[in-house]
Amino acid sequence: MKKKTTLSEEDQALFRQLMAGTRKIKQDTIVHRPQRKKISEVPVKRLIQEQADASHYFSDEFQPLLNTEGPVKYVRPDVSHFEAKKLRRGDYSPELFLDLHGLTQLQAKQELGALIAACRREHVFCACVMHGHGKHILKQQTPLWLAQHPHVMAFHQAPKEYGGDAALLVLIEVEEWLPPELT
């Protein structure tokens, strides 16, 4: 451990003499802005309403025309078929995951609606929905529900690393993100 160097009496007197008449500097060059609250803190009531609104699109009576041969896939008419190819190849990696194992059809619809609402709110354009194998009820219904939602651009059977034929990768249409205004 190093010893502190002490100043001699002469050096201390010289220092006090040189510092006589000085005053403390007022900090006026850097202004620290107050930290803003996170935008993602959404009230619970709004989350419940978004979930209910998003699950409104899912009907059990309507049967969209989906290709039954090969892997499960869908592309909205106004979207390029190349997007489904990108999903199949794994070019998009999902940021949000939803596991539907053990849920009823009603619960699964509500959770799908909540997932789509969360993707739009958080500006996430790719999500993974794991429906599992089970009794094939959710496996059959999930693509039918997703094809009905207007914000679903495309979906494709997930690559092996995301669940294979027991999961779907979904492309969600998100609004253009603008940074919040600094005031």
Curated annotation (Swiss-Prot):
Its EC number is 3.1.-.-. Keywords: Endonuclease, Hydrolase, Nuclease, RNA-binding, rRNA-binding. One of its GO terms (molecular function) is RNA endonuclease activity. GO terms for biological process: rescue of stalled ribosome. Residues 98-173 form the Smr domain. Acts as a ribosome collision sensor. Detects stalled/collided disomes (pairs of ribosomes where the leading ribosome is stalled and a second ribosome has collided with it) and endonucleolytically cleaves mRNA at the 5' boundary of the stalled ribosome. Stalled/collided disomes form a new interface (primarily via the 30S subunits) that binds SmrB. Cleaved mRNA becomes available for tmRNA ligation, leading to ribosomal subunit dissociation and rescue of stalled ribosomes. Associates with collided ribosomes, but not with correctly translating polysomes. Belongs to the SmrB family. This is Ribosome rescue factor SmrB. It comes from Escherichia coli (strain 55989 / EAEC).
